[in-house]
Structures are given as C-alpha cells and as structure tokens.
Amino acid sequence: MAQLPYAIDAETPLNPAELAVLRAQYEREGDMVGLQTKFNYAWVKLNFAPLMEQQLGVMLLAEIFRVSTERRRECLYYLGLGNYKLGNYGDARKYNDILLSKEPGNLQALNLQSLIDEKVAKEGLMGVAIVSGVAVVAGIVGECAAPEFGAEEVKTTLLH
C-alpha cells in the first residue's frame, strides 16, 4: 500500500517547468488520456495556486474515483485534500471520513482531519465574532439613535 503525502506537502506548489511537463502529457493524450496521466495532472492541479486550477483537479479526481476501483483510496484522500484547500470543509470531511472508516490509523488522513477541524473551528469562531460585532454595533447605533427613532426599532432593523 503506497503511502500518501501529508496535507502540508500539498501547500507547496510545483514549479512551472514540472507543471508544463504534466500539462503537455495530459493534452498530448487527448481523449485517450490514461488513468495515471489524469491522476498526475489532477494531483498537480491541487498544488497549483489558482482556484480554477484546483477545482479542475478535484473534478478530475472525482472522475477517476467513479471509474477506477483500484485508485479510490488515493482519490478519497486527494478529494478530501482538494476540497479542504478550496474551503469546502463539509466535502473534505466526507471524503476523509470515508477513508478513515476503512483505514482508522492512516496518519495522513488523521492529519487532514485535524486540519479540517481546526479550520472549521476557526471559521466558526470568526462567524460568531462577526455576528457579535454586528450586535454590538447595532446596540451602539440604537442607543445613539434612540432620541430620534426609538432604540428598539433601530436595533430590530440592524439585526434583521
């Protein structure tokens, strides 16, 4: 069983020359693109910075997952990783959880699970902070506007 890379390894983009080689091979094979070539190209897309390129990588991995039972393990991990990088934490968790249900001790998947959990918790806290900030601002504006408009009316309008 091949070892999967850690999620942090996917944060380092390939250099343009490496990307060009894989792109040329993928394009050369055209409609008859081989499974390994498609997988390599999808993998490199996940490591390429522009969002559209990463989305294409996830799409290619999903295609491979559907047609190749022997590549599903790798695809699950990379689909989880790709969705994590795109900020689709629910999908990332779904794919990673499937892999962990089959391989509970998979260190790379456990590492990815930690990263997903950290991002979800961080973004959840940011969401709470934003909502709290809006409520505080609404309260301040409401109190300042009270003489002219009525505090409750202003607070209700700002919070809805």
Swiss-Prot record:
**TM helices/strands, residue ranges:** 125-145
| Signal peptide range | none
Q: Which Pfam families match?
A: Fis1_TPR_C, Fis1_TPR_N
A cellular component term, taken from the record's GO annotations: peroxisomal membrane
Disulfide partners: none
Question: Membrane topology per the record?
Answer: Single-pass membrane protein
**Membrane topology (Mitochondrial intermembrane):** 146-160
Query: Is-annotated flag, keyword Transmembrane helix?
Result: yes
| Cytoplasmic compartment residues | 1-124
For this UniProt record, give its keywords in alphabetical order, as a comma-separated list.
Answer: Membrane, Mitochondrion, Mitochondrion outer membrane, Repeat, TPR repeat, Transmembrane, Transmembrane helix
Tagged with keyword Amino-acid biosynthesis: no
Q: Cite the InterPro entries for this sequence.
A: Fis1 (IPR016543), Fis1_cytosol (IPR033745), Fis1_TPR_C (IPR028061), Fis1_TPR_N (IPR028058), TPR-like_helical_dom_sf (IPR011990)
- Localization in the cell: Mitochondrion outer membrane
CDD domains, per the entry: Fis1
> Some GO term, biological process aspect, for this entry: which one?
peroxisome fission
* Superkingdom: Eukaryota
Annotated TPR repeat ranges: 73-106
Predominant place of localization: mitochondrion
What does the UniProt function comment say about this protein? Has a role in mitochondrial fission. Has a role in outer membrane fission but not matrix separation.
Record comment regarding domains: The C-terminus is required for mitochondrial localization, while the N-terminus is necessary for mitochondrial fission.
Family named by the database record: Belongs to the FIS1 family.
Return the protein name.
Answer: Mitochondrial fission 1 protein
- What organism does the UniProt record list as the source? Chaetomium globosum (strain ATCC 6205 / CBS 148.51 / DSM 1962 / NBRC 6347 / NRRL 1970)
Its gene is: FIS1
